[in-house]
UniProtKB/Swiss-Prot annotation:
Chain intervals for the UniProt region annotation (Type E motif): 394-467
NCBIfam families: PPR
Name under which the protein is recorded: Putative pentatricopeptide repeat-containing protein At1g10330
Gene Ontology MF terms in the entry: RNA binding
PPR repeat boundaries on the chain: 50-84, 85-119, 120-150, 151-181, 182-216, 220-256, 257-287, 288-322, 323-358, 359-389
Originating gene: PCMP-E71
Source organism per UniProt: Arabidopsis thaliana
Protein family according to the UniProt entry: Belongs to the PPR family. PCMP-E subfamily.
């Protein structure tokens, strides 16, 4: 007999614990159990048992994504004079982090210190991760330093904190000194390098991982996703490695989840292999918005903008809601097809219907849409109508359009604005020099190159560490 409603029952604490564990991932059932516990006064029966129920309720709401309810339960727990234990705090810390409630996380730190749980390794490790995720690397490292004999989980939390905050030199140095590593350790370092754009290093670490002599480390899905991201954004050697990973996934009959499938799709899309990208897309069983975004972007960026727009219509027919990344892909597709009116119409309707707040990157895409069609004056007027000062992404789009249509006068004006915003960006100086050369203004072209040298800027040559 399947139980679907508990509203007509009273529950003992033992029954409540059993049912909460049984329905851990069912939000409606958890709420019903919680309601019965409140209305039957069961939560005042036994302090020890009540503590277990509170902990389980907090963890249950956390599991179903109701972070604020988890945090509110802690307040109710204290008001009911039920003392938390070391198992209470890790779930609460995760809830504070997931709900971006930095102030609540700091308050939990104070509560843990006050109640003597700050020396529990499980609690300490949770705070290492919390401070790392909210951008306070100093507090994260201080908390880690207080852990006596940190286990591999604590070490991985420190690696993650460093990676999230761009401190990959320290992370890699510490990683190399770790006495014990696991797949999470290796994946965290690979992901950290990949997120920072250090793709050569990410691929190097992956190579060391699969050839590791200290222990056999088998890559997992998260490892492949991180490595594939670097493969997609590196050179042809990276693409070859990505194809080898794809072959490994197929040979091991690994299920193509949305995350793994999207990573493969994105790699093939950036490599220009649209047929394989479409094949991967068809193989993904549960097509979430990220998969749709990847295939639309791949088509839009590789000469099939109309097919990208058709894919967008299929996405809506599948009841998948577009997001900000979808909008960028759609605007790119319209720009490549020079469908200015359709692009502006979709920009307005998507933002309105799906409550998407456009960023400067979106506005930059609109400028690119208008400018690519040769409507440079309209693009400049659009920029002037924006409710904020245009940044480099917006002005850069107009500069790109000026290059396409060789409008040296407007290009020079926009280029000088960009140098004011990004005085250390070599591309702006090179662009201005090129515009002046096109206009046969050789003295100005030379002046721009000298200005770049005087600013201590040089073009970075491309390189590859893969053969």
């Amino acid at each position: 007999m399947r139980c679907t409603s508990f509203s007509s029952f009273s529950l003992s604490l033992e029954d409540a614990l059993h049912l909460l564990q049984r329905f851990l991932y069912s939000s409606n059932q958890i709420k019903q159990i919680h309601t019965v516990l409140l209305t039957s006064n069961a939560l005042v029966a036994s302090r020890w048992k009540t503590k277990c129920v509170y902990n389980t309720l907090i963890r249950s709401y956390l599991t179903t994504g109701e972070y604020k309810t988890s945090l509110a339960l802690f307040t109710h727990m204290l008001a009911s004079h039920v003392q938390p234990n070391n198992l209470t705090f890790p779930s609460l810390i995760k809830a504070a982090c997931s709900s971006f409630s930095v102030s609540y996380g700091v308050a939990l730190h104070g509560q843990a210190l006050k109640r003597g749980f700050l020396w529990d390794p499980f609690v300490q490790t949770s705070f290492v991760r919390f401070y790392g995720e909210v951008g306070d690397l100093e507090s994260s490292r201080k908390m880690f330093d207080d852990i006596l004999n940190p286990c591999v989980v604590a070490c991985n939390s420190l690696l993650d904190a460093c990676g999230r905050n761009g401190e990959m030199d320290y992370a890699f140095e510490y990683f190399q000194r770790m006495p014990v590593t696991d797949v999470v350790s290796w994946t965290t370092v690979i992901n950290g390098f990949s997120k920072k754009g250090l793709h050569a290093k990410a691929l190097m670490v992956f190579g060391e991982m699969i050839q590791n002599e200290r222990a056999v480390i088998t890559p997992n899905e998260a490892t492949f996703v991180s490595v594939l991201s670097s493969c997609a954004n590196f050179d042809q050697g990276g693409i070859r490695l990505g194809k080898q990973i794809h072959g490994y996934v197929m040979s091991k009959e690994i299920i193509l989840t949305t995350t793994l499938g999207t990573a493969l799709l994105d790699m093939y899309g950036k490599a220009g292999d649209l047929e394989m990208a479409l094949t991967i897309f068809d193989q993904i069983r549960d097509k979430k918005v990220c998969a749709w975004n990847a295939i639309i972007s791949a088509l839009a960026s590789n000469g099939r903008p109309k097919q990208a727009l058709e894919m967008f219509e299929m996405m809506k027919s599948s009841y998948v809601h577009p997001n900000g990344i979808t909008l960028l892909a759609i605007l790119t597709a319209c720009a490549r097809s020079k469908l200015v009116d359709l692009g502006i119409q979709l920009f307005s309707s998507i933002c309105s219907e799906y409550k998407i707040i456009p960023t400067s990157e979106h506005y930059g895409c609109v400028v690119d849409l208008i400018g690519r069609a040769g409507l440079l004056v309209d693009a400049a007027n659009f920029i002037q109508s924006l409710p904020f000062e245009p940044d480099a992404s917006v002005l850069g789009a107009l500069l790109g359009a000026c290059k396409i249509h060789e409008n040296t006068e407007l290009g020079n004006t926009v280029g000088k604005q960009l140098i004011g915003l990004q005085p250390q960006h070599c591309g702006q100086y090179v662009a201005l020099s090129t515009f002046n050369a096109l206009d046969s203004n050789w003295s100005e072209a030379e002046k721009m190159r000298k200005a770049m040298i005087e600013a201590g800027i040089r073009k970075i040559p491309a390189y590859s560490v893969l053969t």
